[in-house]
């Protein structure tokens, strides 16, 4: 085979697509409390925007409760506002510099909406994996055209790229199925 084609680079990029999908899915609310639920929230602080985890500590004291301990007392209002406006349907209760956030039960309609969103994230992940595959295939065609690899080597490598893509998409489907199970669990 040729040193001109690096399949490990494609593996890294596809693993990146899987990790991105996992990160996106962590932001979806399930029935259980999770500190990662608040990760996407950004706060207007000190003249700029910053992630909530840079102005507060997030803990899970109970299965349906989040606790946000704000480090700077002057930031409590901004953190509370950002959580309310996040679109997650959360209403923090302020207690000094600590915000307690009870997680209400998800109704059936909201669960189905979250499953749809999870499937949209999965489709974005599959598209990203296919883009990586396309880049790999284009590179192989160029190497073949420039006579840097033989047609046989090109065919073998393109089969490896396709197999890698199939495995990546299967892994994404598994990740989404697990998340769907968590969301639909009552």
UniProtKB/Swiss-Prot annotation:
Which N-terminal residues, if any, form the signal peptide?
A: none
Q: What keywords is this UniProt entry annotated with?
A: Cytoplasm, Protein biosynthesis
Question: What is a biological process (GO) this protein takes part in?
Answer: cytoplasmic translational termination
- A Gene Ontology molecular function term of the record: ribosomal large subunit binding
Cell location: Cytoplasm
Q: What is its main location?
A: cytoplasm
Q: GO CC: one term?
A: cytosol
**What role does it play?**
Responsible for the release of ribosomes from messenger RNA at the termination of protein biosynthesis. May increase the efficiency of translation by recycling ribosomes from one round of translation to another.
- Sequence similarity: Belongs to the RRF family.
Q: Which PANTHER family match?
A: MITOCHONDRIAL RIBOSOME RECYCLING FACTOR PSEUDO 1, RIBOSOME RECYCLING FACTOR
What this protein is called in its record is Ribosome-recycling factor
């Amino acid at each position: 085979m040729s040193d001109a084609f690096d399949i490990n680079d494609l593996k890294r990029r596809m693993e990146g697509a899987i990790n991105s999908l996992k990160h996106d899915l962590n932001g979806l609310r399930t029935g259980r409390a999770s500190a990662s639920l608040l990760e996407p929230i950004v706060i207007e602080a000190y003249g700029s925007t910053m992630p909530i985890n840079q102005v507060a500590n997030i803990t899970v004291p109970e299965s349906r409760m989040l606790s946000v301990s704000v480090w700077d007392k002057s930031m409590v209002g901004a953190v509370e506002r950002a959580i309310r406006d996040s679109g997650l349907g959360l209403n923090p209760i302020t207690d000094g510099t600590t915000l307690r956030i009870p997680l209400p039960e998800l109704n059936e309609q909201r669960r189905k909406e979250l499953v749809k969103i999870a499937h949209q994230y999965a489709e974005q992940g599959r598209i990203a994996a296919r883009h990586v595959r396309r880049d790999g295939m284009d590179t192989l065609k160029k190497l073949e055209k420039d006579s840097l690899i033989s047609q046989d080597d090109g065919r073998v490598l393109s089969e490896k790229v396709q197999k890698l893509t199939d495995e990546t998409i299967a892994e994404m489907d598994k990740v989404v199925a697990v998340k769907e199970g968590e969301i639909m669990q009552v």
